[in-house]
C-alpha cells in the first residue's frame, strides 16, 4: 500500500500538473493546488517540507510571532509563499519580497524586520541591511553549497547553510508522512 508520495525536483515541464495528480492524503510535500488552497484558507497543519522546517525552527526557538515584523524574500510555491501564509496566520506583520523587488525597498524592509526568511537568491542583503537582534533563517542553497546569506551577521542570529534548514527539512518530510498516515489510514 502506498501511503506517501514525494516528487524529486527539479522537474522542468508541467511540474504543477504532476503535483496535482497526487492525492492530498499522500501529498507529503503539500505541493498540489488543493494543498496550497487549504494553506491559504488558514490550514497550517501541513506545510511543504522547507516551509515546514522554518515553522519548526521558529517553534523550537519559542519565538512568539504575534506583532513581530517579518520579511520573506522569495515567493516560490514550495518555500516563500507557504512561509508567508504561515507567518500571517501566526499574527506576524509580513512583507513578501522577491528577486524583482527594488533593492532599496528590500533593504528598508530588512532593516525594519525582526525576522528575515531568505529564499530567493544569494547576496540580496548586506550586513548593514539587517536590524540589530534580528533572526535570519536562510532557506537558500546555491551551486557553491552556500545559502542566500553571503556574510555572517554579527548583530543577529541566523541559521547556517549547510546544516540549518536542510536537515530539518528532511525531518519535516518524514513527520508530514507519519502525520498524514495517522490522519487518513
Each predicted region: which residue ranges?
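Short, small-residue-enriched loops and turns at beta-alpha junctions
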Residues: 10-13, 124, 143
Amino acid at each position: 500500500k502506498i501511503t506517501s508520495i514525494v516528487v524529486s525536483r527539479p522537474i522542468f515541464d508541467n511540474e504543477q500538473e504532476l503535483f496535482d495528480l497526487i492525492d492530498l492524503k499522500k501529498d507529503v510535500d503539500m505541493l498540489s493546488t488543493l494543498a496550497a488552497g487549504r494553506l491559504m484558507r488558514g490550514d497550517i497543519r501541513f506545510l511543504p517540507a522547507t516551509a515546514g522546517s522554518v515553522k519548526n525552527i521558529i517553534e523550537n526557538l519559542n519565538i512568539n510571532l504575534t506583532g513581530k515584523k517579518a520579511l520573506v524574500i522569495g515567493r516560490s510555491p514550495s518555500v516563500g509563499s507557504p512561509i508567508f501564509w504561515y507567518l500571517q496566520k501566526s499574527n506576524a506583520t509580513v512583507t513578501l519580497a522577491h528577486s524583482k523587488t527594488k533593492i532599496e525597498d528590500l533593504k528598508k524592509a530588512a532593516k525594519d524586520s525582526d525576522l528575515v526568511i531568505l529564499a530567493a537568491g544569494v547576496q540580496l542583503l548586506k550586513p548593514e541591511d539587517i536590524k540589530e537582534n534580528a533572526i535570519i533563517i536562510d532557506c537558500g542553497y546555491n551551486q557553491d553549497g552556500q545559502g542566500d546569506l553571503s556574510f555572517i551577521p554579527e548583530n543577529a542570529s541566523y541559521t547556517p547553510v549547510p546544516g540549518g534548514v536542510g536537515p530539518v527539512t528532511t525531518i519535516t518530510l518524514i513527520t508530514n508522512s507519519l502525520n498524514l498516515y495517522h490522519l487518513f489510514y
